[in-house]
Amino acid sequence: MARIYLADKETLDSTHANTNAILAALEESGGEHKKAVRYGIKINKSDSGKKSRVTYLYDAVGMTPAAMNYTDGTFNYGSWGNVEFVKNNYPCMVKFDGTEDYKLLATNYALKADGTTASDAANVDYAGNAMAAFKGGWLCQYETATDEYIIWSNVKYDDGYNAYHRTAPDGIIREGFYRRIYTPTLLSNVARSLSGQQPMASKNATQERTYIKANGDVWEHTSWWEWNYIIALLKIMAKTEDLQEAYGNGNMSGYVNDSTKYYGVLASGSMDDKGQFYGYNAGNKQIKVFHTEAMWGDQWERICQMVCDKGIVKVQPYGDCNLTGAGFEKVLDFADYGVSGSVGGYMKDTVMTKAGRFPVTYTGSSSTYLCDYFWLNTGIVAVPLVGGGCSNG
């Protein structure tokens, strides 16, 4: 559940400028870059070590990775606390018409940013939702025969960088995007992001989209580009393939066979006073990254602007977010890698494209290579399910 938000005219004019104009404004007289930064990682395809295969690049060289300190119960930002994409992420309330109403206190969503006034984060009568704002950023992903690359920049450093995570349906690059703080609950047939609610369940993709759209035309599923962008930032910050080890397991094993306990799915809001990032090394508690709960574990999440059409991965850089893949661009055909039928396993070999990373072999483990499981059915047309649930997160 997300939406693109608008920038003021000054920001839009800057963002819409062509690449040469942007770079010219960031260059010294000798042509060297003055303000542009790039934080990147290189992943060695032949190294199975979840940490050893990842190397820092460009401005990230020498930085200390971020990670939870499970002993102290604190999040250690390492060298990343003042990086632009961390500083420009904040919790807020967004009205049904898509305008930002006010910011929340980062350490207690029950309060507005002034630290005194009560917020509407748990108010079911509020005409809007609790959201996490992500501003700016350009992302570059590619591979060579031996390595994969993920690079973030504050500018469009070259033509290999895109900002599809903040591109509106009309193709205009906006200042940023909002992602729901909480897994949506269903209130009066509207999918809402509010604290203290039980997430909706047992809905198909069309039903979910109907309930999300009931907020207003500007509301939509979280897109593949938004989800991929956040995962890329987390990998860069932590310098590891194992995000659960770095940020928290999430509710990956809290399932109970009891409908009165919602089968172990947690109510929203348990992380309201935990700050921007927080997690546990237990397997039945919530996870929060970039002010958004349940990025993995607890409950599967559907995302839009990607479809696997009988084994062919298709993406939509921007547009109507349809669920069929109509008008989407082909990125990868699993058949080219000998993958067909219904398959699954821990990811090992992957292909890094400009649209993201896709696994093509599944003989890894929970502690090697990507450390995550993958399922695929090349016989159907479907949007992705990401993050896992409380029985297999």
Identify the meaning behind each predicted range:
Residues 119-121, 125-128, 157-295:
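Short aromatic-cysteine micro-motif
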Residues 1-30:
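Short, low-complexity N-terminal tether/leader segments at secretion or assembly junctions of large
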Residues 39-45, 226-228, 252-263, 271-272, ...:
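C-terminal, surface-exposed recognition/capping segments
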Residues 309-320:
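A short, polar/charged loop-to-alpha-helix boundary motif
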Residues 6, 17, 136-139, 181, ...:
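Hydrophobic side chains in beta-strands
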Residues 12-13, 49-50, 186, 392-393:
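Short, surface-exposed beta-strand/loop "edge" segments at domain boundaries and coil↔beta transitions
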Residues 23, 27-188, 215-225, 230, ...:
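Extended N-terminal export/anchoring regions of large proteins
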